[in-house]
A protein has these predicted regions:
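Short, surface-exposed coil-to-beta transition loops
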Residues: 120-125
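Glycine-rich, aromatic-bearing surface loops/beta-hairpins
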Residues: 126, 131-141
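N-terminal domain-onset segments
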Residues: 1-119
Length: 144
């Protein structure tokens, strides 16, 4: 689906987040199970936790803004917000969001973030998106 400037939002995301690996796209199939959606984007079949829309949007912005390994800025917060909003609007206001950890939260202790790996990367997280018409994925992988 085209963005406002004629480019695919996922292409723009991949260009702007020029570190690690980015898995981004809209499913080629009608709404499916989370397991099938994860598989379509090359993710392992794990337990994905549902998060609310606000957390889903915040996580999308966070993983575009900085890398997972060292929290180094990859792009400005404004650009990350713009790109994540552009991608997520493809799914509408009733979209549901699923993730593999707590990267969307502020760490409550020195132990930091926890997650269940969905790839073989050292660090990975993102969102699987399910809506009435489309499903999709925005997932990043980083190495230490």
């Amino acid at each position: 689906m085209p963005s406002t400037n004629g480019n695919d939002p996922c292409d723009e995301i991949r260009i702007a987040r020029n570190v690690g690996t980015v898995r981004c796209g809209v499913s080629l199939h009608a709404p499916v199970t989370l397991e099938e959606l994860a598989s379509e984007f090359g993710l392992r079949s794990i337990k994905f936790d549902e998060i609310d829309s606000r957390a889903g949007h915040a996580l999308a912005q966070k993983i575009l803004h900085a890398d997972l390994a060292h929290a180094k800025e990859v792009m400005s917060k404004a650009r990350a917000s713009e790109l994540s909003d552009e991608f997520l609007k493809l799914f509408g206001p009733k979209a549901r969001f699923f993730t593999n950890g707590n990267f969307h939260q502020t760490p409550r202790s020195m132990s930091g973030f926890t997650w269940t790996p969905a790839t073989s990367a050292t660090f990975d997280t993102g969102i699987l998106i399910v809506s009435g018409e489309h499903c999709g994925c925005l997932w990043v992988e980083d190495e230490d």
